[in-house]
């Protein structure tokens, strides 16, 4: 099997061949740290986290770089409004970003450079562009002259003439072309600045990623990722300035994730549907958010709504439910090595599903990281495994039946972990779910446990009318009770 990825640059799916065999150099544009991160940031972070995990699963040695933009107009405005400095604002929101990412199970990249710590490299690239006559100084600012770069527009598929005709760029008489973009901004009162050959100032946004990508990964590297909103102008401008300066291709494969809509509308503060990651995690389990993101192909748009999150929640609960049932009813005792014939004899179809999962999972993920299809493969095995368990009613499984069930559960979990899913024990996930969802009932966990204990006592006393009354009373408040040989469990909804 061979990994294929969709390359935005060529508009086609291509075999992935890294520059150096066995090694992958991978850069993703990080957040601008002036506010809390939103659900769109969560999608991008989760998508590229899974790509990072899968590349390592395939055996690649991956160097993953994701930057922080910690100097920007928005950060400056936020600092001025708060009566503090840009560094304090950036540090506050970097810390908040890490908290959100840790909750979502997003691995830390290998390197996370700050833009402010890489300004000398940005100045050097601008100096090269000036020396080549591709950049020009206008007042205290320095601009990139797009007409000096013949390939401008090749990533986004736009023609300069068409862009000019439909341009909604602010008119700046200093520019030679309205689409020329800033490389260096002359200093203004109250703004951070660095010394440069063109006077004190700060870098433009686009030059930051070119400098950090080339510093840590080389002048040409394998993968550059980000949201589709970054294709133009940010990534287009990165290509132009990098290739003009270095004289070689900047990136081999450009990967872009799709947008997140809220109830089928574009997310925006003006529409009042802007959701921070923290807003969402007040009500939704972080692993459910992750499952939701991965249930669609990364290039497709996704719609975030109560309905779609509810579907993700049910799907994740099904997987955990089956794993929990195996753990409860097929617990490993004295390990025995069963022959294939004995295991297959328990359920040939389940045995074959377990054996086929690895290949099916690889086939899905090798097809441009198709996590939706990969999850479908996990659910196919989960359904067969649950049917197998159901054949035994509530009995404990023994011998080869127990071994087969555990093999199925292990296969599901091992492959889910590549996606960063099923990272908890089933009972821990269920407890976390209850803690989140009980808020909507007005009850506390202690009150539910007290009701269960009173009902248990009533049943023990053979006062079944009282036991039924207690059950009906708590179910009216949205709590479902499930009796089992191990005791009574409860869930919300």
Swiss-Prot record:
Residue window of motif 'KMSKS' region: 266-270
Motif stretch ('HIGH' region): 31-41
SUPFAM superfamilies found in the cross-reference section: Anticodon-binding domain of a subclass of class I aminoacyl-tRNA synthetases (SSF47323), Nucleotidylyl transferase (SSF52374)
Enzyme Commission code(s) on record: 6.1.1.16
Organism, as annotated: Syntrophobacter fumaroxidans (strain DSM 10017 / MPOB)
Name recorded for this polypeptide: Cysteine--tRNA ligase
Lineage summary: Bacteria, Pseudomonadati, Thermodesulfobacteriota, Syntrophobacteria, Syntrophobacterales
Family: Belongs to the class-I aminoacyl-tRNA synthetase family.
UniProt cross-references to InterPro entries, sorted A to Z: Cys-tRNA-ligase, Cys-tRNA-synt_Ia_DALR, Cys-tRNA/MSH_ligase, CysS_C, Rossmann-like_a/b/a_fold, tRNA-synt_1_cat_dom, tRNAsynth_Ia_anticodon-bd
């Amino acid at each position: 099997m061979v990994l294929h990825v969709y390359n935005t640059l060529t508009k086609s799916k291509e075999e992935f061949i890294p520059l150096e065999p066995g090694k992958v150099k991978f850069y993703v544009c990080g957040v601008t740290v002036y506010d809390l991160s939103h659900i769109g940031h969560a999608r991008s972070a989760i998508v590229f986290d899974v790509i990072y995990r899968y590349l390592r699963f395939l055996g690649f040695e991956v160097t993953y770089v994701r930057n922080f933009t910690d100097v920007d107009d928005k950060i400056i405005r936020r600092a001025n409004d708060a009566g503090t400095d840009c560094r304090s604002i950036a540090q506050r929101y970097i810390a908040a970003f890490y908290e959100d990412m840790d909750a979502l199970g997003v691995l830390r990249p290998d390197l996370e450079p700050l833009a402010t710590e890489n300004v000398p490299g940005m100045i050097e690239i601008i100096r090269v562009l000036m020396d080549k006559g591709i950049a020009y100084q206008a007042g205290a600012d320095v601009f990139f002259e797009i007409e000096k770069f013949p390939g401008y527009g090749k990533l986004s598929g736009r023609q300069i003439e068409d862009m000019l005709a439909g341009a909604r760029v602010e008119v700046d008489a200093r520019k030679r072309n309205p689409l020329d973009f800033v490389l260096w901004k002359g200093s203004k009162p109250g703004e951070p600045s660095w010394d440069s050959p063109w006077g004190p100032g700060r870098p433009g946004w686009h030059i930051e990623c070119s400098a950090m990508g080339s510093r840590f990964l080389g002048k040409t590297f394998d993968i550059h990722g980000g949201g589709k909103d970054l294709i133009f102008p940010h990534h287009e401008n990165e290509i132009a300035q990098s290739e003009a300066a270095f004289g070689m291709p900047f990136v081999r494969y450009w990967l872009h994730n799709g947008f997140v809509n809220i109830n089928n509308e574009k997310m925006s503060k003006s529409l009042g549907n802007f959701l921070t990651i923290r807003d969402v995690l007040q009500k939704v389990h972080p692993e459910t958010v992750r499952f939701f993101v991965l249930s669609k192909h990364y290039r497709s748009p996704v719609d975030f709504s109560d309905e779609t999150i509810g579907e993700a929640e049910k799907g994740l609960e099904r997987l955990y439910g089956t794993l929990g049932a195996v753990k409860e009813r097929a617990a490993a005792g004295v390990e025995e090595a069963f022959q294939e014939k004995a295991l297959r004899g328990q359920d040939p179809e389940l045995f074959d599903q377990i054996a086929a999962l690895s290949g099916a999972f690889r086939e899905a993920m090798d097809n441009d990281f198709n996590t939706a299809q990969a999850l479908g493969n996990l659910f196919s095995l989960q359904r067969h495994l649950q049917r197998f368990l159901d054949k035994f009613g509530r009995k404990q499984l023994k011998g080869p039946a127990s071994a087969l069930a555990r093999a199925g559960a292990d296969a599901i979990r091992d492959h889910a972990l590549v996606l960063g899913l099923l990272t908890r024990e089933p009972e821990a996930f269920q407890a976390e779910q209850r803690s989140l969802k009980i808020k909507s009932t007005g009850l506390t966990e202690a009150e539910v446990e007290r009701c269960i204990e009173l009902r248990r006592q009533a049943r023990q006393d053979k006062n079944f009318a009282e036991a039924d009354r207690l059950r009906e009373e708590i179910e009216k408040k949205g709590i479902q009770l499930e009796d089992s040989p191990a005791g009574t469990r409860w869930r919300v909804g």
